[in-house]
A protein has these predicted regions:
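Cys-based phosphatases of the PTP/DUSP/CDC25 superfamily and their flanking regulatory architecture
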Residues: 1-251
Length: 251
């Protein structure tokens, strides 16, 4: 009931639909578009790609975005460079069920406007989580390159939820993310940037909310509202937490 209420009153609400930017060829899916009032813009031509600001309490700032298209790889890296992004969380595979879900944006051959260099070999943080480190700069004379770490979670299928055993993997991922992110926004993407991405951001926020309450209050009762949290996410990026299964997984 909660999920259906949120879906009808936010995702398909006329007022919210009117907030969406018009469709263009930069969108992977025509029905998943950012809201006009919190779209992430990049410096060149005040251009936007399919990315939304997600601001949550306690300085938890995210950019929720789609998996880059071949035609938006440079825009994606310009966004990361402009906003000094330190961590990218990738929640999809390049292909799933024989369908392309995301361009291989970390292949330096696909990057034209920036110089992208992988700093060291990728490694497995834990089973199902690959870690890659990159350095990105505008040109050879750029003496202040941005270093970015990509956390690639590979065991979460589209429109689904991870198995229960994956909770420990997610917590490990949260801890690793916290170590690297500093005060910069964290880029989170899957394919559309709403289902898995919204669920991940909700879980990250709840995890820290619970830890903070335990530390600050030393109380036996933990208070939070999943419905309110998902409502906030949907108001910042349409269709965040895309289906009922993902909503239940948060619980």
């Amino acid at each position: 009931q909660e999920f259906n209420y949120l879906k009808q009153n936010i995702d398909y609400d006329k007022e919210h639909l009117e907030r969406l930017l018009p469709n263009n060829n930069l969108n992977r899916y025509s029905n998943i578009r950012p809201y006009k009032d919190n779209v992430v813009t990049i410096n060149s031509e005040n251009k936007n790609i399919n990315a939304s600001w997600i601001h949550l309490p306690n300085n938890n700032n995210f950019i929720g975005t789609q998996g880059p298209l071949d035609t938006t790889i440079d825009d994606f890296w310009e966004m990361c460079y402009s906003y000094k992004v330190k961590v990218i969380v990738m929640l999809c595979k390049l292909q799933e069920n024989n369908k392309i879900k995301c361009a291989k944006y970390w292949d330096s051959n696909n990057v034209k406007k920036f110089i992208l260099k992988q700093i060291n070999s990728e490694f497995d943080l834990i089973d199902g989580v690959k870690v890659r480190n990159f350095e990105i700069k505008k040109n050879q004379n750029d003496f202040f390159p941005n270093t970015v770490i990509q956390l690639h979670y590979t065991c979460w299928d589209d429109h689904s939820t991870p198995d229960v055993d994956s909770y420990n993997k997610l917590i490990k991922l949260f801890e690793f993310l916290d170590y690297y992110k500093d005060n910069s926004p964290v880029v989170v993407h899957c394919s559309a940037g709403v289902g898995r991405s919204g669920t991940f951001i909700a879980l990250y926020n709840l995890y820290h909310n619970i830890l903070r309450q335990i530390k600050d209050n030393q109380i036996n009762e933990i208070k939070f509202s999943i419905m309110d949290l998902v409502r906030k996410l949907k108001e910042m990026r349409t269709h965040s937490v895309e289906n009922e299964g993902q909503y239940k997984f948060i619980y």
